[in-house]
Amino acid sequence: MRKVAILVAIVAAGLAGAWWFDLPARLGFAREPRQAVLYGNVDIRQVSLGFRVSGRIAELRVDEGDSVKAGDVIAKLDAEPFRQAVGAAEAEAEVTRATLAKLRAGARAAEIAQARATHEERLAELENAKLAFERAKQLRPNGTISQAELDQANASRAAADARARSAREALVLLEEGNRAEDIAAAAAQANAATAKADSARISLEDTQLAAPSDGVILSRVRETGAIVSPADIVYVLSLTEPVWVRAYVAEPDLGRVHPGMKVTITSDTAPDRIYEGTVGFISPVAEFTPKSVETPELRTDLVYRLRIVIANPGKDLRQGMPVTVHLPEAKEAS
């Protein structure tokens, strides 16, 4: 009987101990290691493409659903008006460069020699005019010549003197060369004409529309023959690389997430396929949970936005698709 009592006491003590140690868990004070789950969507990354110049669309090379690579030419404008503009701008630039070169080179040696000869000729004419005036002045007192003839001789001397001074100034200008201000003005005109030609060439290059990155054509907005301006959209491109997931983490779980952390992602479309991802960005600003996020928590909770970069996403993850982000297991203190 005594042995039975001892056995009953041992069993009762064991049950009491089990109940005691299980009490915190039943009261919610202790939790088992768990795997946190976040909810989000594959980020929508699109770019609207258009020409930087106005013109008529001559060719559209891709259609909706076509895949393109960065640098692929997907549309062209009629380039003939732009080629003509380039030709005119280059000709104008060549004229201004020639004018500048002429000013910098100054007068040729033959031109200076000719100006010097002209000056010497004008000096000789001036000397003859002076002699004629002196003779007329001596003849006038005795009445050999009239006053009108004396005045004519004086006028001829003054005209010869003016021609000699003009020839001298022309020679000095040629010998000294062009003014620095004139050369600077010509240089500025040449630079402006060169810049205009460069701009015309850039406009010619802009008649081709190239894909800025790899992607899939989402929309073809215009058709061949349409007249477009720089504000008009021709294509909408969906960017396929890299694939980002936009997810949200509540403030109590924020300490479990850090940039560079590895996570796994699943989708409702292929729940058995697991994608590997890396947390690349955590927003420093809290926001309310977006209405598009499927979450069991209250939508009025403040959350922090995450950007997760998917490695080897394949073609199953499409933009806007809802996904589930699984964080690594973490033990929480009781």
UniProtKB/Swiss-Prot annotation:
Residues 101-208 form a coiled coil. Its main location: periplasm. The keyword Coiled coil applies. Keywords: Coiled coil, Periplasm, Plasmid, Signal. It is found in: Periplasm. It comes from the Bacteria. Disulfide bonds: none annotated. The keyword RNA-binding does not apply. GO terms for cellular component: periplasmic space. Residues 1-18 form the signal peptide. HAMAP family: UPF0194. Belongs to the UPF0194 family. This is UPF0194 membrane protein RB0873. The lineage of its organism: Bacteria, Pseudomonadati, Pseudomonadota, Alphaproteobacteria, Hyphomicrobiales.
